[in-house]
Curated annotation (Swiss-Prot):
This is Small ribosomal subunit protein eS25A. The modification N,N-dimethylproline is found at P2. Gene3D superfamilies: 3.30.63.20. Component of the ribosome, a large ribonucleoprotein complex responsible for the synthesis of proteins in the cell. The small ribosomal subunit (SSU) binds messenger RNAs (mRNAs) and translates the encoded message by selecting cognate aminoacyl-transfer RNA (tRNA) molecules. The large subunit (LSU) contains the ribosomal catalytic site termed the peptidyl transferase center (PTC), which catalyzes the formation of peptide bonds, thereby polymerizing the amino acids delivered by tRNAs into a polypeptide chain. It comes from Saccharomyces cerevisiae (strain ATCC 204508 / S288c) (Baker's yeast). InterPro entries: Ribosomal_eS25, WH_DNA-bd_sf. Component of the small ribosomal subunit (SSU). Mature yeast ribosomes consist of a small (40S) and a large (60S) subunit. The 40S small subunit contains 1 molecule of ribosomal RNA (18S rRNA) and 33 different proteins (encoded by 57 genes). The large 60S subunit contains 3 rRNA molecules (25S, 5.8S and 5S rRNA) and 46 different proteins (encoded by 81 genes).
Amino acid sequence: MPPKQQLSKAAKAAAALAGGKKSKKKWSKKSMKDRAQHAVILDQEKYDRILKEVPTYRYVSVSVLVDRLKIGGSLARIALRHLEKEGIIKPISKHSKQAIYTRATASE
């Protein structure tokens, strides 16, 4: 085999820029999910909406109120306790982590 031919500095630099290597992998290309902007203070409009809509729901829980009414979780828990005290909804299952309610029927 003949000896390897020595390249000049300019030739070496041109070879380095020629881009023979693959670019580094980017770990995250996903778009970030927008942060929810739910209400944390109950105004009269939200209160009226809760009193009007929630009695029509068949299944009522904190997550249902957060999803449908765009209110915070602590506000939803307070609203559920208030509606239960008023007799508008009745509990199905209650424990420290999750409370599930249904609408109260007139016969009960």
